[in-house]
Amino acid sequence: MAIAESFQLSDGYSVYAGVRARRDGVVEDAAFALAKIGGTDGTSAASKILEALLRRDVSLVMLDGCIVSFYNWVDGEALYAKFKKPVACYVFEEPEGRVEEAVRKLFTDWEVRIEAIKKLGPPTVYYTKSGYKIYIRAWGIDPVDAGRAAEYCTGFGKIPEPLRVAKIIAGAARQFLKTLGKFRFLW
């Protein structure tokens, strides 16, 4: 199972898409949720998707990043505690920038945000057999095992197929919602 998001700052919201996929990457179902850009509702959006898609046979929840939507976040530990399924957060590019410094400048509730981001913990670097570097945070599963799981369902490149598909679907849904906004007079 995988959850990814898509946003543009001008939208004011981020579209989260989740897919339930088999180990071979074949997608069986999808669900959506919205979160506010710069909000604090990323975990809630991911939780709504899990409520819609989770089954007993799901063995891992994959997240495309934990710090998302302009410093919103998804709390993998909270999802693991609530749903009793291992959760792994993957980042495919080297983390850059000074997150704490930016959060202090941008948000009045910066203390709460920094505490939540620190609670995520530092990522573990995992090197794939094909030489890619993945940054992994994990709850209920060893980060190395989460890396192996990602490799297992990666057809090409470094992004596991369920996350790649979830990201594509999130982007398409965001574009569709923007199109609907242009035609509100029809309803």
From Swiss-Prot:
Pfam families: DUF99. Disulfide bonds: none annotated. InterPro entries: Endo_dU. It comes from the Archaea. PANTHER family: UPF0215 PROTEIN MJ1150 (PTHR39518:SF2). Belongs to the UPF0215 family. This is UPF0215 protein PAE0952. It comes from Pyrobaculum aerophilum (strain ATCC 51768 / DSM 7523 / JCM 9630 / CIP 104966 / NBRC 100827 / IM2). The lineage of its organism: Archaea, Thermoproteota, Thermoprotei, Thermoproteales, Thermoproteaceae.
